[in-house]
Amino acid sequence: MKRLLLTSALPYANGHIHIGHLVEYTQTDIFARYWRMTGRRCISLCADDTHGTAIMIRARQEGRSEADVIADMSAAHQRDFAAFQIRFDHYGSTNSPANRALCEEIWASLRERGMVTTKEVTQLFDPQEGMFLADRFVKGTCPKCAAPDQYGDSCDRCGSTYAATDLVEPRSALTGARPEVRSAQHLMVAIEPERPFLSTWTQGEGRMPKEIANYLAGHFLSEPLRDWDVSRPAPYFGFEIPDAPGNYWYVWFDAPIGYMAASKEWCDREGEAFDDWWRSEETEIVHVIGKDIVYFHTLFWPAMLKSARFSLPSRVQVHGFLTVNGEKMSKSKGTFVLASTYLKHLDPAYLRYYYASKLSSKVDDIDLNLEELVNKVNAELVNKVVNLASRSSRFVAQTGLSAVYPEDGGLFASAAEEGDAIGAAYAAFDYARATRSIVALADRANEYVDRMQPWALAKQPEKKAELQAVCTVALNLFRQIVLYLAPVLPKLADDVARLLGCPMDRWALAKTPLVGTPVAAYEHLMKRVEPGAVEKMIAEGRPAEEAAAPGGAAGANAEAGQAAGGGAAAEDDGAALAKEPLAPECTIDDFSKVDLRVARIVAAEHVPEAKKLLKLTVSLGGEARRTVFAGIKAYYKPEDLIGRLVIVCANLAPRKMKFGLSEGMVLAAGDETVHLLSPDSGAKPGMRVH
C-alpha cells in the first residue's frame, strides 16, 4: 500500500483555535488514526501560517517582534490541538528556513518556465504608515447601499463585493488617515497555460468531491484563468523575493509550500528522503481543507507543483462550514467558542464524536446543535457503548475472561465482518456512516446483555461459569466497538486497553476474541454531558456586557435593530417611496391568500446557466424543504447565506425554469440593490407571518 502524506489547512498565527477550526483538524486526525491502525505508513503534518500584514500590524500594536507573536501563537495552537487529541507527526511554521528554501526553488521553476509576469496594480496607500493597505485595513461607506463603516472588499449589510478604491470616503483602519490611490508593480503567475491540464486533473476519479470538480469546471475552467498576484510591496512580513528586492511573496504563495516545509523538517529529523514523499508514485498526498479555499488548492497549487516537478495531490477532501444551533457562530450569542473555553467545561471526546457523526465525504455544512450534542453523547456513547463495560466487567474482575471464547450466536463473527465496512467508511471520509454502524453494533451487544442478565446470574453461585461466559462475550463485543471507535476516541481506547489489559492500536485485533486474560477493576470511562456545563460554556463566550444585560431577549432584539437600522435617520428621506409608489389597495381577503413563512436557508449554490440567480434550499421546519431560485447572485455569496432566517412566500405556485423547479419566493427589499428580509430573533422556521 502506498505511503500516505496527510495535511490540514494551516491555521493563521493571528488568532486562537475555535470550534469551527476543529471540524477540519478532527476530520484529518480521524483519517490518520484509522490508517495507522491498519498498519499503513502515514504522516500527518501541519504548521502555522505566519506571514502577512495582519501579523506585522499586531506585532507593532503590541510592541513586540513578529517572531515573538508567532511563537506564542504556535505554542497556543499546539496546546489546543494536543488537548483535543489531535496528533501531528510534525508541526512547523511557514516562517522557517525550510519554507524559504522551497519557496525559492519553486519560484525559480516558475521563472524558468516563463510563468512569472509583472503588472501595474492600483491600491490604496496610507501616507501616515507609509504602506499599501490590504482590503481589510480599509473602511468606508459601501458604494452600493451607502452602509457606513464597511471593509474594503465587501459590505456586511447588502453583501456586495467591490474594490477598495470604490469605497465612499475611505479611511485607513490603522491610522484613520484618508488613503491615497497609488500604483505599484506586482509579480504575477500565469496559470492560464495550465488550464487544459487542470481541466483534466480536477476531474480525476476520487480527486475531490464531484460537486467541487463540477464547480471548478463551470466557474473557472470554462474561461481563461486570471494571472495570480503573488507579491506585496514593502513593508510586509514575509520572505523577500530574491530577484525582486523590496517585494515579498504574498501569504497565499508561501502558505501551501508550508506543507512541504513541514515534510522536509520531519524527514530531516527522522532520516527520511524528502523526495520519497514529494516526488514518488509510492506516496499518496491528501489535503483536507474547507470549501472557502478550494481555488488555491485545486488550481494555483497543482500548477505550482507541476512547474517544479513535484507530486500532485492524490485527493483534496473538502468540508463545509460549521453553524451552531442553525446559525453562524456568534460572539454576542456565545456560540463563537474558543477551544480553550470549550475545554474548561466539556470533554473533547464529546465534540470529536459529534463531529464524526456528522462528517461525510460530501461538502455539506455541519450544524453543531448543542441540545443534540448532549443527547447524542449521553444516549449513544454513555448509555450504549460505555455502559456495556460497566454492566459486565465488575462480575469478572476476580475471575478474568473465559479461557475459551463461548458460543454467542454469531455476534462476535458478525461484528468482525462489519469491521471491513466500517473501515471502508473511514477510508472514504464517511465517518457518519461508520458511527451509525458502530452504534448499531452497540445496540446488538446491549440486547445480548439484556437477554442474558449477568446481574441475575451473579446471584446464583452455581452459575458462576455461565456468568463468566456471558461477561466474556459482552466485553469482547465492547472491545470490538471501542476498537472501531478508536480513530474518533483515542483516549477511550487507551482507557479500555488498561481495563482489559490488551492492546487497542490495531484494526485487525477486532477479528480475534480476547480470552483467558484478567480484567481490571472498573473505573468510569466517560461522564454524562450535563446541560448546565453547555450553558456555562455559552455564557463564558458572550461579551461581558451581553451576559450581564437584563432581559436577554430584549437585549438581543435591541442589538439586531441597531445592526439593521444603523444610519436610519439619514436614509428615511422618502426617495425609495417616490421611486416605487404604493401598489393599489387590496382587501384583507386578498392579502390572506398569501402564506408568508419563516424559513432557514440550509443550502445555497450558484446556477452556472444564470447570471443573476442563486439556488436556495430552505427549510420550513422538520423535513419540509423547498427549492427557490432567487435573483440575488450579485449581492450575496452562497456561503454567507447558510443558516440565515428569511421570509418566503410558501404557497406560490411552482414555476418551471430551464434549470429546475422554483417552489416559492424569498422576500427582499431594494431597487438598485437587494436586501433580504429576516425576522427578529426568536422566530423559528415554519412560523407564519401575520
From Swiss-Prot:
Cellular component annotations (GO), alphabetically ordered: cytosol
Q: Which residues cross the membrane?
A: none
Q: What is its EC number?
A: 6.1.1.10
The reply to whether Nucleus figures as a keyword in the UniProt entry is no
Residue window of motif 'HIGH' region: 11-21
Q: How does the cofactor bind to this protein, according to its record?
A: Binds 1 zinc ion per subunit.
Q: What InterPro entries does its record include?
A: aa-tRNA-synth_I_CS (IPR001412), Anticodon_Met (IPR041872), Met-tRNA-synth_bsu_C (IPR004495), Met-tRNA_ligase_1 (IPR023458), Met-tRNA_synth (IPR014758), Methionyl/Leucyl_tRNA_Synth (IPR015413), MetRS_core (IPR033911), MetRS_Zn (IPR029038)
Q: Which CDD domains match?
A: Anticodon_Ia_Met, MetRS_core, tRNA_bind_EcMetRS_like
GO biological process terms, alphabetically, are: methionyl-tRNA aminoacylation
Q: Domain tRNA-binding, which positions?
A: 590-690
Motif placement: 'KMSKS' region:
328-332
Q: Which UniProt keywords apply?
A: Aminoacyl-tRNA synthetase, ATP-binding, Cytoplasm, Ligase, Metal-binding, Nucleotide-binding, Protein biosynthesis, RNA-binding, tRNA-binding, Zinc
Cofactor dependency: Zn(2+)
Write out the function statement from the record.
Answer: Is required not only for elongation of protein synthesis but also for the initiation of all mRNA translation through initiator tRNA(fMet) aminoacylation.
Which family is it part of?
Answer: Belongs to the class-I aminoacyl-tRNA synthetase family. MetG type 1 subfamily.
Q: How does it assemble?
A: Homodimer.
User: What is the name of this protein?
Assistant: Methionine--tRNA ligase 1
